């Protein structure tokens, strides 16, 4: 075990009995040979259960849909990448030369996948209870801020339901432009709706984020939101 990986383990708050699991969890498919995709698959499932179990116990009056939206907020790629950056996970990743040169160690999806892989690795190395303890510790500050007011449906869903209830055509989203390097792109999206003379627009670090912002502007233009 190198001093570098020992530093990462201190940040994670967990020391592996089988260090090879940690090395595998940090190995992107671009590196060649065995990679972390299977651990990512396992970690994704373990993470979803840990967060679901926590939310089920904490929000006893919450409906299924509310619990699902709270969980989605916690396990989405943006959140996972944020936590990965708190551990400086990018500097420990094993990437192929091309992926490294293109800034893959900063890419949100790669960081999020690596964090899920580490969760899967801890689960295999120590079992569910230890893994759950670590995950809840990493997510603690974010979990404490959750409340049922956070379960409102996202802007795209609300806009779609508003239009469907009035038997109107669904919104049309179009990417106007994509700017920046692959690891730090900015998407500019237009949303067109029958009945609104002007299209609304939104920008974000992904197409999904930009579409959500454009939908929010449409809700404001329609007078649904204030």
Swiss-Prot record:
Mg(2+) binds at residues 40, 113, 116. It is an enzyme of class 3 (hydrolase). It holds the Pfam family dsrm. GO terms for molecular function: double-stranded RNA binding; metal ion binding; ribonuclease III activity; rRNA binding. Its EC number is 3.1.26.3. Keywords: Cytoplasm, Endonuclease, Hydrolase, Magnesium, Metal-binding, mRNA processing, Nuclease, RNA-binding, rRNA processing, rRNA-binding, tRNA processing. GO terms for biological process: mRNA processing; regulation of gene expression; rRNA processing; tRNA processing. The gene is rnc. It comes from Hahella chejuensis (strain KCTC 2396). NCBIfam families: RNaseIII (TIGR02191). Its cofactor is Mg(2+). Its main location: cytoplasm. This is Ribonuclease 3. Residues 154-224 form the DRBM domain.
């Amino acid at each position: 075990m190198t001093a570098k990986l020992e530093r990462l383990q201190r940040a994670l708050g967990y020391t592996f009995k089988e260090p090879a699991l940690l090395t595998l969890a940090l190995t992107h498919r671009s590196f060649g040979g065995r990679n972390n995709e299977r651990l990512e698959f396992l970690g994704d499932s373990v993470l979803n259960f840990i967060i679901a179990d926590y939310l089920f116990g904490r929000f006893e009056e919450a409906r299924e849909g509310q619990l699902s939206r709270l969980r989605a907020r916690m396990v989405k790629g943006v959140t996972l990448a944020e936590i990965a950056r708190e551990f400086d996970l990018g500097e420990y990743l094993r990437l192929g030369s091309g992926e490294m040169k293109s800034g893959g160690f900063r890419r949100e999806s790669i960081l999020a996948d690596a964090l899920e892989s580490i969760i899967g690795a801890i689960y295999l190395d120590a079992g569910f209870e230890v893994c759950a303890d670590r995950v809840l510790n990493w997510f603690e500050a974010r979990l404490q801020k959750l409340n049922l007011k956070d379960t409102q449906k996202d802007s795209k869903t609300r806009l779609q339901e508003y239009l469907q209830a009035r038997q109107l055509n669904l919104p049309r989203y179009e990417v106007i432009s994509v700017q920046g390097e692959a690891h730090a792109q900015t998407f500019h999206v237009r949303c067109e709706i029958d009945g609104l003379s002007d299209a609304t627009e939104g920008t974000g670090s992904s197409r999904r984020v930009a579409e959500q912002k454009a939908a929010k502007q449409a809700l404001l233009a329609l007078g649904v939101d204030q």
